[in-house]
């Protein structure tokens, strides 16, 4: 009789859960874990196509959403993930704009646009969206366009955006999120296996990244019934005991 028991070699390495926990705490990925979207080589090399195609796809919605905000003279605005600066022309010149992005190549393009347009009210700098190097309540308005589904930790990024926004300030997001329609959601989940290698996610749930933030929802809508994009405009609550978004709806 052949035994069904297979003995493991004494030299076989066993997985140590303590090691896994330490690796997770220090950001060490296992061999099977895919790199974060923004670290994708394809993502870094797609800048020419980004500048050619992306304006046709998204610029109109971004510009309209910025121009829908009441922006007072002297207000401080932070754009997280400014990229090559395709959104910068939509901001009024009477405000002070700071743009941050991880890609220094994209920021070089943004600086070219700033110099060519002689914009003295705009400054861009390299920075991680998940670790914004600004004090709490530094800005009156914080914006981000099609970035939250690109970063490693979307919830962390949104938390940082809320932190640097002053109480009573506004947060504006344009992004695609997982559809509430089950059929479309399944398609997006399948597509995510491919899009992650191109630098973005299609399975990100809106509630997962904003429901615990101290924000009051002002507007949440799609530009058209068939649009893949969602536009969110919210106000930072000042009272730490105030209801969260999920409770304020």
Predicted regions and their residues:
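Conserved class I S-adenosyl-L-methionine
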Residues: 7, 13-72, 86-87, 109, ...
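C-terminal alpha-helical "lid/dimerization" subdomain adjacent to the S-adenosyl-L-methionine
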Residues: 34-37, 49, 54-56, 172-230
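Helix-to-beta-strand junctions that scaffold the AdoMet/dcAdoMet cofactor pocket
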Residues: 72, 151-152, 165-166
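Glycine-centered, small-residue-biased loops immediately flanking beta-strands
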Residues: 75, 169
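Class I SAM-dependent methyltransferase SAM/SAH-binding core
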Residues: 78, 82-131
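A short acidic, Gly/Pro-enriched loop at the edge of an enzyme's catalytic core
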Residues: 130-141
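A short SAM/SAH-binding and catalytic strip from SAM-dependent methyltransferases
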Residues: 141-153
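A short glycine-rich, Lys/Arg-flanked "PGG" loop and its adjoining helix->strand segment in the class I
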Residues: 155-167
């Amino acid at each position: 009789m052949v035994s069904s028991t297979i003995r493991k070699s004494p030299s076989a390495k066993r997985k140590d859960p303590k090691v896994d926990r330490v690796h997770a705490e220090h950001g060490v990925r296992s061999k099977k874990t895919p790199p974060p979207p923004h670290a994708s080589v394809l993502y870094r090399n797609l800048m020419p196509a980004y500048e050619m195609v992306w304006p046709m796809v998204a610029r109109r919605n971004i510009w309209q959403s910025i121009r829908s905000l009441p922006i007072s003279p002297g207000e401080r605005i932070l754009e997280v993930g400014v990229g090559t600066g395709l959104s910068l022309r939509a901001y009024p010149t009477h405000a002070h704009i700071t743009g941050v992005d991880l890609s220094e190549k994209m920021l070089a393009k943004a600086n070219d646009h700033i110099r060519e347009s002689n914009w003295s009210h705009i400054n861009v700098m390299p920075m991680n969206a998940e670790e914004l190097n600004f004090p709490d309540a530094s800005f009156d308005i914080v914006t981000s366009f099609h970035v939250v589904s690109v970063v490693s930790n979307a919830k962390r990024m949104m938390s940082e955006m809320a932190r640097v926004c002053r109480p009573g300030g506004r947060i504006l997001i344009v992004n695609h999120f997982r559809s509430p329609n089950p059929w479309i959601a399944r398609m997006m989940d399948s597509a995510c296996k491919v899009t992650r290698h191109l630098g973005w996610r299609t399975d990100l749930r809106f509630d997962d990244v904003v429901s615990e933030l101290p924000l009051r929802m002002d507007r949440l809508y799609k530009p058209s019934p068939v649009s893949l994009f969602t536009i969110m405009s919210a106000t930072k609550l000042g009272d730490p005991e105030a209801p969260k978004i999920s409770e304020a709806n």
